[in-house]
Swiss-Prot record:
Record field: catalytic activity: UDP-alpha-D-glucose = UDP-alpha-D-galactose
Pathway: Carbohydrate metabolism; galactose metabolism; Glycan metabolism; exopolysaccharide biosynthesis
NCBIfam families linked to this entry: galE
Gene behind the chain: exoB
Protein name: UDP-glucose 4-epimerase
GO biological process: galactose catabolic process via UDP-galactose, Leloir pathway; polysaccharide biosynthetic process
EC top class named in words: isomerase
Length: 348
């Protein structure tokens, strides 16, 4: 670390040992942007964090810890990933989600105000839309979440808006669609032991690390009868976060935008692409629809391109699948898989 880097303001990344947080830390490091991360490592992986990034092991629910880190590392902006993200779990453990995702975000925003930090990039979700009336889903679509996970994220969005109106805090809220894939250089990826994301689950089934892939519903009103989702490569998502940070550091105002490509792929398309990439057959079974699964979830993606100048580099489905499969194969050679998709600075 150079003296100049040590003296530069840092961006605080919460949950930097998790799936998305670690990719963003690598993107920041690649761009020469100093960062520090807080993660309690309850689900994140220490080795996913770039060597140049200081790790403070702890819980973002601690106001004292946040105050100290923001002061000691001269933090001027925050990227907030830490939290709980499993939709079915949120239904059976709703209060855990309101604590980890909403109450801890309140603690974080309070620390920002005390430290005079007025720039926040927030990891939100398309789950705030609930069951959309039409696709593609634009940012002005109704927000009617149908599970505590989506509701907990929407509450944090509202806190950011209110803090902006009252205190001048500026934020970029990024609503993710279906994040998938892994760092093309193999530095990090999704290492969740019990995965629920389709592409990761399909790769694990292909490699014999879990039972055959269950395809839920083949009678949807889609071209091949299976659900369609907008899959975005995690490295493109990480680049969007860097652009959002630079926008705020240039004095830009608050933004709300979807993170997706504006086009979707069906479950059958994902499976077929994985088979083409691997040259092997994915073991799969067919099951009834899952309650609450919309036929299509596709982002309206014009705003992020227009307002941040975001240009995806990894938007081919075969590239997303290939990077995910390569990462899964690398995990076969390692011991233990303690990772998290969204970060783990506070997680039940």
């Amino acid at each position: 670390m150079t003296d100049q880097t040590a003296a530069s303001p840092r961006v605080l990344v919460t949950g930097g040992a998790g799936y998305i947080g670690s990719h963003v830390l690598h993107a920041l490091t690649d761009a020469g942007i100093p960062a520090v991360t807080i993660d309690d490592l309850s689900a994140g992986r220490r080795e996913a964090i770039p060597a140049a990034v200081p790790l403070v092991e702890g819980d973002i629910g601690s106001a004292e810890l946040l105050d100290r880190v923001m002061r000691d590392h001269r933090v001027d902006a925050v990227m907030h990933f830490a939290g709980s993200i499993v939709v079915p779990e949120s239904v059976v453990k709703p209060l855990d989600y309101y604590r980890n995702n909403t109450a801890n975000s309140l603690t974080l925003l309070g620390a920002c105000l005390r430290a005079g930090i007025d720039k926040v990039v927030f990891s939100s979700t398309a789950a705030v839309y609930g069951a959309p009336e039409s696709v593609p889903i634009r940012e002005d679509a109704p927000t009617v979440p149908i599970n505590p996970y989506g509701a907990s994220k929407l509450m944090t969005e509202q806190m950011l808006r209110d803090a902006g109106a009252a205190h001048g805090l500026r934020s970029v809220i990024l609503r993710y669609f279906n994040v998938a894939g892994a760092d093309p250089a193999g530095r990090t990826g999704q290492a969740t032991p019990v995965a629920t994301h389709l592409i990761k689950v399909a790769c694990q089934a292909l490699l014999g690390r879990r039972p055959p892939l269950a395809i839920f519903g083949t009678d949807y009103d889609t071209p091949d009868g299976t659900c369609i989702r907008d899959y975005i490569h995690v490295s493109d998502l990480a680049d969007a976060h860097v652009l959002a940070l630079l926008h705020l550091r240039r004095g830009g105002g608050s933004l709300l935008m979807n993170c997706g490509y504006g086009r979707g792929a069906s479950v059958r398309e994902v499976v077929r692409t994985l088979e083409e990439v691997s040259g092997e057959q994915v073991p799969a079974t067919f099951a009834d629809r899952r309650p609450g699964d919309p036929p299509q979830l596709v982002a309206g993606a014009d705003r992020i391109r227009e307002q941040l100048g975001w240009v995806p580099k990894h938007d081919r489905l075969d590239g997303i699948v290939r990077s995910a499969l390569s990462w899964e194969r690398s995990l076969e050679q390692s011991v233990g898989q303690a990772g998290a998709p969204g970060g783990s600075a506070s997680r039940s």
